[in-house]
Amino acid sequence: AFRRSEGLFVVEGARELLHCIHSGYEVETMFYCPEILQAYDGAAEILALAREGVGHEVSAKVYGRMAYREGTEGVVAEMRAKHLGLADLRLPKDPIVVVLERVEKPGNLGAVLRSADAAAADAVIVCDPLTDLFNPNLIRSSIGAVFTVPTVACTSEECIAFLKERGIQILTAQLQDSSLYYDTDMSRGTAIVMGTEATGLTNVWREAADAHIRIPMKGTDLKGKVGLLDFH
């Protein structure tokens, strides 16, 4: 609660921190252990930043007590949050957008962001989220993709209006009344919309859809299905 009220979030790990910094986020405070950090790519850049006055050197023992998880590459930083909205998205012609409704588990959202990053999706829009976009578990599971893929949160109604105004077709992933995803033309601007693994999409999305698609995979693995659709 304090972190959110102050507009701050925590990043652990050299890779995640560099993704964050390169995406324009400001370091508020940083704690680092050179003994651990120097073994990782990007250590020189992080140490140079630390010497500018935002870094505090700590021993391996102290760092071990501070770190949220093991193997975090010797650095943990408190960052200043940036809350992007739909108006901040700069989409190319015929974009691929991933839309997630009411996602609850930070680890799942992080994995979806990782898949979206690997597939070069142009944006991820999280509608009516039940988790914080700067949750430490989300940042960790995304391996920093939450900073490299434009990611915004909004209501489902706002997102639908945004997509319709830009002529981006809405494809909802669902089992009922749907066609196989590979029979659908995704060469134009496309938003792939998925709900939670437990309950799927709400009616507001089913009714707004231009087409309903399904993915012939056993189980309800949301992150796997997003990855498959993005690569298609």
Regions found by a protein language model. Give the residues of each.
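RNA substrate-binding interface of SAM-dependent RNA methyltransferases
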Residues: 22, 47-48, 59-61, 83-84, ...
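Structured adenosyl-cofactor binding patch, chiefly the S-adenosyl-L-methionine
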Residues: 77, 118-119, 133, 138-145, ...
